Design a protein with these regions (language model features):
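A short alpha->loop->secondary-structure connector
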Residues: 103-110, 127-132, 176-181
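Class I S-adenosyl-L-methionine
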Residues: 1-116, 120-121, 143
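Conserved class I S-adenosyl-L-methionine
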Residues: 263-268
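Short, glycine-/small-residue-rich phosphate/pyrophosphate-handling segment
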Residues: 118-154, 161
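A contiguous loop/helix-start segment that scaffolds small-molecule binding in enzyme catalytic cores
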Residues: 2-19, 32, 82-84, 152-244
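Conserved alpha-helix/loop element of class I SAM-dependent methyltransferases that forms part
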Residues: 245-262
Length: 268
């Protein structure tokens, strides 16, 4: 299904859409403004977990997100001008549904009421300065997205898709030669089943992990690990090739001279 990206407002004053961030603590963490938005909506869209958390406040129709997601987005946009509420995890504008909605709905049509993000809660539990931490969502994404963020001394917070995610991260890091990396698994942050556990990647024996989890990664040395360098010139043996490969030194000099920026591509 194709979704229109038209952001023409329904009327000059209509803020018909409210996106409410809700944490694992449910109603207890909601402001009066958020509660009023949920109770006053004709339709409340959200995941089944979010709808269950807010069930006592919902007076209109509770609409679970379908799979795939696009028909649900189309259903929200079809109600333009009506009071609609969308429930999201934590901060809707941080790897959340609010980002997708903002591509289709003008800022003067919507209100976003965030809750603390999983990253904020994790940084608080670990007392890590969030401004100095790399953050990444692996929800529905390959583990290879971790690779560019891995560096000695760098702290990384990775949001996973489910309870199998932390063990998969541990195996991936071990395969890169980072079995000594410390993994801290933070589960159900802000909820009744909150738990924080720590293991080295090579000896990851936590067993069952809550589906709502985030993994903190840190290591100080990586002498023999496959870490992406910050400067151009990747090792020759990192490429699949038939022997016809521009040598590392020439690649490094060429890239340095061209100084490419994000989004540019050189075909050698």
């Amino acid at each position: 299904m194709t979704i229109s990206r038209d952001k023409t407002p329904a009327s000059p004053t209509a803020k018909w859409l409210t996106v409410v961030g809700i944490g694992a603590d449910g109603l207890a963490g909601l402001s009066d403004r958020a509660r009023a938005a949920i109770a006053g909506a004709d339709h409340v869209f959200g995941g089944t977990r979010h709808l269950a958390l807010a069930a006592r406040l919902i007076e209109g129709a509770a609409v679970p997100w379908p799979s795939p997601f696009d028909p649900g987005m189309a259903a929200v946009l079809a109600r333009r001008g009506q009071p609609v509420c969308v429930l999201a995890s934590g901060d809707p504008m941080w790897h959340g549904v609010g980002v997708t909605l903002a591509r289709h709905v003008a800022a003067d049509e919507m209100v976003v009421i965030p809750a603390p993000s999983a990253f904020s809660l994790a940084a608080a539990r670990l007392t890590w300065p969030l401004a100095e931490v790399a953050t990444l969502s692996l929800h529905g994404r390959a583990l290879a997205h971790l690779w560019p963020h891995l560096a000695p001394g760098r702290k990384l917070l990775a949001l996973t898709s489910d309870g199998a995610g932390p063990a998969a991260i541990a195996n991936y890091l071990t395969a890169l030669g980072l079995g000594h990396a410390t993994l801290t698994v933070l589960e159900d942050l802000g909820g009744p089943a909150e738990r924080v556990r720590q293991r080295p990647a090579a000896n990851f024996d936590l067993g069952s992990v809550h589906d709502l989890n985030l993994v903190a990664i840190e290591f100080t040395t990586a002498a023999t690990a496959a870490i992406l360098p910050a400067a151009p010139g990747l090792p020759d043996d990192w490429f699949a090739h038939d022997g016809q490969l521009t040598k590392r030194e020439l690649r490094a000099l060429t890239l340095s001279a061209l100084h490419p920026t994000a989004g540019q591509r050189l075909w050698d």
